[in-house]
Amino acid sequence: MKKLILILALLIGNICFASEVMILHTSDTHGRISPIEYNGVKNMGGFSKRLVFVNEIRNKNKNVLLLDSGDYFQGSIYYRIDYGKRIAKLLPDIKYDAIALGNHEFDNGTKVLKHNIKNSKTQFLSANVHFKDRYLKNAVKPYIIKEFDGERFLIIGVTTSSLANLSDTNNITVTNPIDEINKIIKQVKYDRLIILSHCGLDEDRQIAKAIPSIDLILGGHNHYFFQTTERVGNVPIVQDGEFGIRVGELKFDKNLKSYTYKNMTPELISDANVDKKIEKINHHIKKVTSEVLANSQIVLIGNQSTLEHNQTNLGKLVLTSMAKAFPEYDAVLTNSGSIRVNRNLKGNITYADVLEILPFDNDIVMVEIQGKHLNEVLFHGQQQNRRYLQYYVKDKKIDNNKVYKVITNSYIAQGKDGYDNFKYGKVVKKSPVPPTKLLIQTLKEMQVITDKKLNFENL
């Protein structure tokens, strides 16, 4: 009888008390391995502080998962110097369980992605991106399973289905994430289902609605800082911001028990060995990028929160440099998402600043487009969240029937970022000079930046 009671007690214990798992979550680091100034606060974030915090949690908890929702490499000077090689080589120190593929992982094609995955020694996930390359076919998995005290956690990675509209999608095929998740959950035995997503909140909501058995969606792509989880039915969704500013903490037993987060604030301790590695990288960057190109007597507004919703003088500086590609232009425009310095600038402007201002390698092109379609482009650009258009048009009023010569970047000229009205235009010229070089030339010519010099009427 005693033996029977003991067996029943064990069974009841197993049913009622699932093991607690601590899930740590990050997203949209965009190559910020050193601390940055964020919203006016210096020394925020940084890979080294993140590492120390993660290891503290691991030391205090038996079961820990460390997951990232993608866009890990591209977007800073650290990426520009070697396409992410040095960023990737830091990843083995922190030991992520998995990172979802974000759209910016593809900005320089699958060859660069392959090298970064090899150097990172980290498992990357995407169930709905399919590769032609043999190495990437094997290296990027659709899912992983992590077992804690007999409970199987199925973690499926998904990437935005709009990938073709956002990045270089040569040599890959992108399928519907909902379809791919459904295929996997029919085939794999699991107890808990986590979606590691770089789809964006709207698509995550669709996934949650379509598959209500999901236990948790860890999201990214929008750069949102959630204060609490959002729920679609019983499915919790969370995002943990950008640039390594914070780490999300989710306690999980049978269900999500709690969600909080830790901001990587200036006073947090960093790891001495990692600090040495990053200092070595910084020394290399300083050596090759410290040349002063100009001095700004005005504050150039580059913080993302302002750029997302307004035209700024830094945007005007970038447009001024683009205009030098084709002097016969009628209009010049670029999406604010192409400008990523995320801080205001004053005083000496260096080569390093240029690489942060323009981290992407898009060509400068001239598009011939009818006035009515140009109006549609401008209208769209003023409705965008996080992608507000920086632009200048010579005509005070656009003639719907006139054909305009418009300078822009190849990214939105291809209709990406929702600028599909460019399909009515035609690319007639491509500048042989990259945008960073045009900006460097412009800064050297200006020497001193003033409001007057940023007035297009004075060019």
Segments from the language model and where they lie:
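Sec-dependent N-terminal signal peptides
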Residues: 4-13
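Short, motif-level signal for alpha-helix interfacial/capping segments enriched in acidic residues
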Residues: 8-9, 199, 347-349
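Extreme N-terminus of proteins, especially the signal/transit-peptide cleavage junction
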Residues: 14-19, 288-289
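Protruding loop/beta-arch "assembly-hinge" segments enriched in small, turn-prone residues
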Residues: 433-437, 441-459
